[in-house]
Amino acid sequence: MNTEDVQLGMYVQVRRGFREADLRDRIGIVRERFGNHSYTPFEVQFGDKQPQELLWATEFEEWRV
């Protein structure tokens, strides 16, 4: 996914090839954007009681129902 396409509040799904097995295929909500357009990590929340994770746009894709 391109950094420019990521919107706060959108649902995303972590890619199957993600480095941490426990996050692969998980669905979360983009809560925050950091950095600038050339170096932008996103804070993604995966549940009410789960800690938020910093991910790059290349590590997830938009999730559609």
Question: Predicted segment positions?
Answer:
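Basic/aromatic-rich interaction segments and small domains that mediate binding to polyanionic partners
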Residues: 3-64
